[in-house]
Amino acid sequence: MIRSALSNWREYLTPVSHKSTFLTTGQITPEEFVQAGDYLCHMFPTWKWNDMADDNKYRDFLPKDKQFLVIRKVPCSERAQAVVTMDEIENGTSTDAFSAADDEDNDDDSIEIIPVSKSSSGADNDVNDIDELMEEMELEEDDDIVANKTNEMLRYYDLFITYSTSYRVPKMYIVGFNGNGTPLTPKEMFEDITPDYRKKTATIEKLPFYKRNVPSVSIHPCKHANVMKVLLDKISVVKERQREEEMQKNAEVGAPKSAGSDDGDNENWEDLQQDIDDSLRVDLYLVVFLKFITSVTPTIQHDYTMEGW
C-alpha cells in the first residue's frame, strides 16, 4: 500500500509534457494517448472510452470523455501458474510439474469400474438396455464434472487503460470477478499474473479515475517506454535493410533516377519521410502495448479484446 500511495503522489506531482518524444524515448503525450485510444476503439470496438459520469474523477489535460479506456467481462479460464507449469513441462525444466501430472494420471487409473454382470436368463435385451443407460449416465456425469470444474475456474476481468503522467505511457488496471459476479480479492487477482511479474510490476491500487473505492491490480508502467523504444529501433533496422535491398535491386536492373533540378531540394523531405516510414506509427501504440500485457497476464483472453462484438 505504501508503494501505491507513492505512485499516486508521483502521478499527481509530475508535470504534464506535451512535447512528443515518441521516436526517441518510446514515451507519448496525452494527445498521442488519445490518438492511440481512438485507433484502438476504431479497430477493436470491444474497447471503449469512458462514459461521462458523476462518479468519475477528471484530469484537465485529457478530454472528459477520453479519460480512460475500458473493456468489460474479458474471460479468464485458468490461473497463470497453469500456463507456466505447462511451459515447464514442454521444455522439460520442472520435475515437480511432471510429478504432478503423474499423480493426476494415477488418480484416473485408480478409479474402479465395476462391470454389470449379465444374467443367464433370456433377458439379454433388458441387460443391454441397462448397460446403455448406465453408459449414458456415466457420460453425462463426466460432462457435469468437467462443466463444474470449468465454471469454478472461469473468471472475468474489466480492463482499464489510462495515461501515466509520471512515466508518460499507458497504464493498465485489472478488476476481476468470479463466475458468479462476485469481486475477486487482490490476492485472487494476483493468481492471474505470471509469477515472475507479481513482485516486479504488479501493485494493489484503487482505481484512480473513480471517486468510489474500487480495488484493482495495476501493471506498473516503468518498463513500457524502454520496451517500445527497443521495438522502434528494431523496426528502423529492418526497414533500413529492406530499403537498401530495394535500392540494390534497382541499381542492378539500371532503374533510372528521377530527373529534375529540384532533386536536391527534395532530399530533406525524402529523409524525413523515410524516418516516418521506418518507425511505428504512434496510433498503433496501444495495440503493441496490449501485446506486451499478455506476457504479464497470459490467461486473461486478450485476443478476445481484439475482436469485434
From Swiss-Prot:
Example of a GO MF term: Atg8-family ligase activity
TM region positions: none
Region (Handle region): 226-284
Alphabetized InterPro entries for the sequence: Atg3/Atg10
Function in brief: E2 conjugating enzyme required for the cytoplasm to vacuole transport (Cvt) and autophagy. Required for selective autophagic degradation of the nucleus (nucleophagy) as well as for mitophagy which contributes to regulate mitochondrial quantity and quality by eliminating the mitochondria to a basal level to fulfill cellular energy requirements and preventing excess ROS production. Responsible for the E2-like covalent binding of phosphatidylethanolamine to the C-terminal Gly of ATG8.
Subunit structure: Monomer. Interacts with ATG8 through an intermediate thioester bond through the C-terminal Gly of ATG8. Also interacts with the 40 amino acid C-terminal region of the E1-like ATG7 enzyme. Also interacts with the ATG12-ATG5 conjugate.
Annotated protein name in UniProt: Autophagy-related protein 3
Species of provenance: Candida glabrata (strain ATCC 2001 / BCRC 20586 / JCM 3761 / NBRC 0622 / NRRL Y-65 / CBS 138) (Yeast)
